[in-house]
A protein has these predicted regions:
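Non-transmembrane alpha-helical segments in soluble domains
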Residues: 96, 100, 120-123, 163, ...
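GST-like domain detector, emphasizing the conserved glutathione-binding G-site
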Residues: 2-149
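Short, hydrophobic secondary-structure boundary micro-motifs
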Residues: 106-111, 199-201, 221-226
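Short, flexible helix/strand-to-coil boundary loops that buttress conserved ligand/catalytic motifs
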Residues: 41, 93, 134, 195, ...
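GST-like fold's C-terminal all-alpha helical module
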Residues: 126-212
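Charged phosphate-binding loop/patch that engages nucleotide di/tri-phosphates or the phosphate backbone
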Residues: 209-223
Length: 228
């Protein structure tokens, strides 16, 4: 099975027996509550890199950002990956692309051509839907008197439109897992936990069936969202 593109090791990462590996040590700032973090740890698992990464539980509070963390990551979000040379990688899309380059794996991100950009676009759709959902959740937890009816209507429409687009595509998704599918799986799992009233599965049986199969994968089952 084709692997991720290792290229000519242009960044100088270590190679052993023809495989490009992670520099050591590597630190992932994470939380089991973040769907974007979940996307990264599923990719780590699929790439066989989980044991090479130290995890540090990090709180990324939107209203009370940690000044020390902001010095390393100006946006203060998670996930963030710290490499041994002090380099910092964020956000989840950048981290995932890095992981698919440094370690051969079933081709989560094709090397080139239309197939590559199909996967990147699918990831962008899933991540964009998740960004919208997270903003919508912030509106939902405001005091009822301060909530905007127009905001709710707009973001409900965005969520439904994105879900319909994913549902329309799901039947044509390749059998082999790719990065765009991982992003979609992480976003849909978050909807199950935080937005059960959205009932995204209703009328989208194909997408729902795909998601059930995704969640049964060992990499997904080992990295469930935990909303403590």
């Amino acid at each position: 099975m084709p692997g991720c593109d290792t290229g000519a090791n242009p960044l100088g990462w270590t190679q052993d027996a023809g495989l490009i590996g992670l520099p050591q040590p590597v630190l992932l700032h994470w939380s089991p509550k973040s769907p974007f973090v979940r996307k990264v740890v599923i990719v780590l698992d699929e790439c066989g890199l989980t044991s090479q990464v130290e995890r540090r539980r990090t709180v990324a509070d939107r209203l009370r950002p940690d000044p020390a963390y902001l010095q390393r990551h100006p946006l203060g979000t998670i996930p963030m990956l710290e490499l041994d040379d002090g380099s910092i990688l964020y956000d989840s899309a950048v981290i995932c692309e890095y992981l698919t380059i440094i370690r051969p794996t079933p081709a989560l991100l094709p090397r080139a051509g239309r197939a590559r950009f199909d996967v990147l676009r699918r990831q962008a759709l899933a991540d964009g839907m998740l960004d919208a959902i997270l903003l919508w959740r912030q509106e939902r937890i405001r005091p009822p008197a301060q909530q905007s009816t127009a905001f709710h209507a707009a973001y409900a429409l965005k969520a439904r439109t994105a879900l319909d687009a994913l549902a329309a595509e799901a039947a044509q998704w390749p059998e082999a897992l790719d990065l765009g599918q991982i992003a979609a799986g992480a976003a849909l799992a978050y909807l199950d936990l935080r937005f059960p009233d959205l009932a995204w599965r209703d009328g989208r049986n194909g997408l729902a069936g795909w998601h059930d199969r995704f969640e049964a994968r060992p990499s997904a089952a080992a990295n469930r969202l935990v909303l403590d």
